[in-house]
């Protein structure tokens, strides 16, 4: 495997991880945003 191929390989992994992980992280953040007020109001997880 030459350097150029290796760089494209790494870039592909990075893009795949970014595309996969960021929506999951965003979904978790949104869930926490909704969960937060519920915890304060009701005192338990929704």
UniProtKB/Swiss-Prot annotation:
Any GO MF annotation of the entry: toxin activity
Expression sites (tissue/organ): Expressed by the venom gland.
Protein modification: Contains 1 disulfide bond.
Entry keywords, A to Z: Disulfide bond, Secreted, Signal, Toxin
Positions of the propeptide segment: 21-33
Chief location of this protein within or outside the cell: secreted
Disulphide bridges, residue numbers: none
Cellular location(s): Secreted
Leader peptide range in chain numbering: 1-20
One GO location term (cellular component): extracellular region
Family: Belongs to the formicidae venom precursor-01 superfamily.
Name by which UniProt lists this protein: U-myrmeciitoxin(01)-Mg6a
